[in-house]
């Protein structure tokens, strides 16, 4: 039979996009990648993963797969203070994290949502200055990170009300407002310079080596200012944004920038060919996070997929959380000051193991032995095939037994549970399947499969 593939957009009819070309001008659409393979989902996912790695900017973060602690999710939730940060930094260092990212709230003493935009430390939160916190992180061997939403200014930001309208996305002579924010228009070179100065200042003043760049808004169908069509203003904004990032990395090649947008938005390789890490969710429930962990490597390379790990209850809860992140990029958070000794040790074990296998995660390709999981799935499974070994995460959110089909089962030399190290479950290979008996529902284990 025949296979027909149609790619379209942006168009005027569907997207309100058009661009007028003068004689001699040309226009090239954004690139799109498609995998054409023999086989099904897994060969296609492998091919797309290799393609994404090939088009991506070479960077040390995606070579090292740094472990990041972020103080937001199920942790401080945007309410930082010096006292809180210092104690959490100590815990992050003890766990074996390599970066510490101070998330939202560091720039305002009160309700900060609609006042973002100047990116200056809040003296009420940090009486001795933000540098005290950054210096403490550095003293513990951690590289320091800060949260930014660099493309917006809140409607209550004093600076925003002093700036001309052409700094912002506008329609019908007024600034577009979404979620109490104005959107900066990166087509304006003054905007790009201002934002670059912010980044350079934070790097120079605080020793920041990591930015989590969020985007909790949408500019809708674009701007009618200085553009053929509103939608083309969106395209031009993103082209300028990408160029802005490329210029930053030319001057700061070791800087790490995480791509975030209310969790996992803007997860495209226009952004991810430049930025090394992608936030995949703002999901606060670790059980639902497993559904994301089991599927997300279809859309992002495993080493770029930041997955929240935020344990705060019993041992199986800790294990489930850690397994969520083990074959992606574990992104540590949670109320770590409440963890007992056993839970801390279980977390340390997971992070230490991740450091042992992360080069194989970096070089391997994802596979989905049960296909894509759904919210109703009783069993979830996701794996990474590396050159020598295969790693497989298995979750049982609604059952205690899992049956996972294995490719080339007759060639398997050994299967073992590598997290947790005590195993604490039953398993065997039977009729070409890995059969797992968990100690309870809502359990997870990480397996290593070695071939003959």
Regions found by a protein language model. Give the residues of each.
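Active-site and adjacent substrate-binding regions of carbohydrate-active enzymes
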Residues: 104, 108, 122, 190-269, ...
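Generic structural signal for hydrophobic
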Residues: 88, 92, 137, 202-203, ...
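Active-site-proximal substrate-binding groove within the catalytic cores of carbohydrate-active enzymes
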Residues: 241-427, 433-448
């Amino acid at each position: 039979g025949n296979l027909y593939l149609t790619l379209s957009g942006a168009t005027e009819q569907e997207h309100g996009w058009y661009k007028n070309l003068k004689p001699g001008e040309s226009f090239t659409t954004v690139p799109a990648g498609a995998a054409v393979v023999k086989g099904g989902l897994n060969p296609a996912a492998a091919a797309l993963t290799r393609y994404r790695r090939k088009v991506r900017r070479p960077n040390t973060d995606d070579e090292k797969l740094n472990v990041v602690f972020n103080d937001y999710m199920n942790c401080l939730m945007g309410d930082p203070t010096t006292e809180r940060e210092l104690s959490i930094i100590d815990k992050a260092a003890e766990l074996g994290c390599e970066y510490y990212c101070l998330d939202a709230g560091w720039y305002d003493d009160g309700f900060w949502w609609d006042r973002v935009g100047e990116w200056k430390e809040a003296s009420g939160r940090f009486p001795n200055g933000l540098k005290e916190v950054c210096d403490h992180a550095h003293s513990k061997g951690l590289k320091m990170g800060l949260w930014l939403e660099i493309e917006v200014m809140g409607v209550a930001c004093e600076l925003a009300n002093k700036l001309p309208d052409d700094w912002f996305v506008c329609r019908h002579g007024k600034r577009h407002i979404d979620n109490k924010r104005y959107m900066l228009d990166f087509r304006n070179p003054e905007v790009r310079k201002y934002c670059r100065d912010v980044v350079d200042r934070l790097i120079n003043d605080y020793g920041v080596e990591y930015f989590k760049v969020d985007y909790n808004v949408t500019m809708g169908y674009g701007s009618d200012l200085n553009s053929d069509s509103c939608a083309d203003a969106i395209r031009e904004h993103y082209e300028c944004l990408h160029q802005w990032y490329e210029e930053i990395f030319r001057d700061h090649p070791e800087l790490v920038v995480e791509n975030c947008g209310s969790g996992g938005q803007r997860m495209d390789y226009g952004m991810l060919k430049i930025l090394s890490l992608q936030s995949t969710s703002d999901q606060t429930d670790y059980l639902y996070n497993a559904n994301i962990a089991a599927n997300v490597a279809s859309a992002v390379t495993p080493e770029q997929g930041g997955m929240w790990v935020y344990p705060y209850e019993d041992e199986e809860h800790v294990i489930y959380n850690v397994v969520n992140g083990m074959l992606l990029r574990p992104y540590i958070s949670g109320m770590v000051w409440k963890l007992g000794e056993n839970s801390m040790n279980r977390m340390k074990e997971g992070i230490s193991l991740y450091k042992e296998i992360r080069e194989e995660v970096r070089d391997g390709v994802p596979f989905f032995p049960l296909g894509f999981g759904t919210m109703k799935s009783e069993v979830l499974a996701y794996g990474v095939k590396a050159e020598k070994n295969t790693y497989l995460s298995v979750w049982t959110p609604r059952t205690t037994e899992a049956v996972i089909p294995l490719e080339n089962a007759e060639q398997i030399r050994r299967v073992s549970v590598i997290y947790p190290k005590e195993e604490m479950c039953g398993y065997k290979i039977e009729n070409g399947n890995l059969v797992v008996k968990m100690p309870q529902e809502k359990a997870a284990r990480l397996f290593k499969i070695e071939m003959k």
